[in-house]
């Protein structure tokens, strides 16, 4: 049911096809897939996060609401957020990564798992649906979560789970949430001066390799201009 290889990703693809072609067939199929997704997750516990968890599904539901004009999708989005928030750990200011089971939660901060992807998803949902920050985060200490994410240092620079991905997410959420935007430039420059290295990067792909790092560097130059 997730974004990367499940129904949530299929819904987003179908809606993009509908936006491009205006063929209602794509919208109808997206709604059917959405119904199947909602029914599927009622009977199971999912992961937190954008790539493989509740957040990716919530983005798909928000887009369905936007393209169909049906308000009930907002309630589904909020239900998914509340389910995800059951995995929030205030001692970490993060949502637990339970890929290894609830008995062994991990404090993962990345686009794919953890706070970075979840913050990005809810920022997107806010822009798509108009749901407020109070509605989306409810009892979550948003500023502390953002601060914790921004202070996370990674050992690699890939988009998926490295420093480049975190910095791009940080730029977007600071802008959407109106949270100390000027600090992004200082933070990005600090990590670039201190840690950027591609000597050990053997993957040439976008999400986990050199292409993704190149995209970040272009993004950095664009933002500085």
Give the ranges of each region predicted by the language model.
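Glycan-recognition and catalytic cores of secretory/periplasmic carbohydrate-active enzymes
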Residues: 1-225
């Amino acid at each position: 049911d997730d974004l990367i290889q499940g129904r949530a990703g299929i819904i987003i693809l179908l809606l993009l096809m509908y936006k491009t072609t205006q063929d209602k067939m794509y919208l109808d199929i997206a709604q059917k897939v959405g119904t199947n997704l909602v029914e599927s997750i009622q009977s199971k516990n999912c992961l937190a996060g954008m790539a493989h968890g509740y957040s990716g599904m919530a983005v798909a539901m928000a887009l369905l609401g936007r393209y169909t004009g049906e308000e009930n999708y907002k309630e589904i989005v909020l239900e998914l957020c509340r389910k995800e928030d059951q995995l929030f750990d205030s001692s970490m200011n993060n949502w637990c990564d339970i890929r290894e089971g609830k008995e062994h939660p991990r404090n993962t901060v990345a686009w794919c798992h953890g706070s970075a992807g979840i913050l990005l998803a809810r920022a997107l949902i806010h822009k798509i649906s108009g749901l407020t920050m109070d509605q989306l985060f409810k009892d979550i200490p948003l500023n502390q979560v953002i601060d914790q994410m921004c202070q996370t240092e990674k050992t690699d620079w890939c988009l998926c789970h490295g420093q480049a991905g975190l910095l791009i997410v940080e730029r977007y959420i600071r802008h959407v949430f109106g949270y100390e935007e000027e600090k992004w430039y200082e933070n990005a420059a600090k990590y670039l001066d201190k840690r950027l290295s591609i000597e050990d990067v053997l993957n040439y792909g976008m999400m986990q390799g050199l292409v993704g790092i190149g995209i970040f560097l272009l993004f950095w130059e664009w933002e500085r201009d």
